[in-house]
Curated annotation (Swiss-Prot):
PANTHER family: BNACNNG10540D PROTEIN, F-BOX PROTEIN CPR30-LIKE
SMART domains reported in the protein's UniProt record: FBOX (SM00256)
Listed name of the protein: Putative F-box protein At1g47390
PROSITE patterns: FBOX
Domain of life: Eukaryota
Amino acid sequence: MAPEEKLPCELIEEILSRVPPESLVRFRTVSKKWNALFDDKMFINNHKMTFRFILATESKFYSVSMTPKIEVRELSLDIPGLELKPKILIDCNGFLLCGMEKEGIVVWNPWLRQAKWIKPKVNQPSLCFNGIGYEYDNMKLESSGYKTLVSYPNELDPTRSVWKIHDFASNSWKYTNLVMSCSSGVTLFGASVSLNGILYWVASHLKNNSLFVLVYYNFSNEKVYKFSDLPCGENHHHDVLVLRIFREDRLSLLKQCHLTKKIEIWVTKNKIRNCSSGDVDSAEWMNFMEVSTLNLPVLVHPSYFIDDKKLVVCSCDQTGQAWIYVVGDNKLISKIQIDSVVGPWPLHCSFFPSLVSIPRSQTKKAALQV
């Protein structure tokens, strides 16, 4: 019998690049090579998966992409209970999180048309879903299942928070004491980002709110640690500070001075690697970009991503109208008003589509097209 001929790798990639993303998930178990291929950036780009912004208004969701022109598409979403505008919209580990306060949160992968409700066991009007991460399995750098961190005000002392962890696999909740291993108390500032199962925040010192640091939360031992001082030095509490993931394995920080409107982008110099315990190595920062032209906008709760050497920002003007700004070479390259987005002051976040499937427990399909 003649030996079985194998298809060239290039031909396999070409064939798989034509398969709908929702069908690719089933092929992850074919081989380790195929599984790694679906996470390969070049393969993802062949599926036209690029950074975009997701916007949510009172009754609609939109995807805003650059190909290279601005393309706005309304998302047709059929998830019961998500008819109203969410209170929180963040991207985390390739998923989108829509926080509905006391109703819970919807975790979805719009690219794969998958969605899942996480319902809280506590009836609190101001639940805060802080992000999704995972523990590390003993001495192996492997995840042991997704978890989400939630907080809400303590009934006896509203100035303090109660913290709980939801486990995706068991659909169970447990209380956790958020132990601060930092040398002094801090207040978390803005939304978290998730990298390698670890949640990161900008935080301000309780005793001096002009001093900011980066902290991270380790799901393995349920503690908060200081990651580094902010690379941009001392800050005013009116300055814009936004943390993001950079090139999938590093962090980036956007700062806009509230007085001069100058924008700085800082990135970690090297890849951020987790230790076997799930802890994180210290980082060195470098200045990636500075823009100080006179026609810069005042950024209001911006979301952003870095496209090669350009900064792409979504922000609202004084009337609540959404705009996309492209910045590079120390100048404002372009600004585009998103006219087709219905409703002022939309929530928005940057999002990079992924082929990571939502954990199977109680997964629901949603008729959503990106």
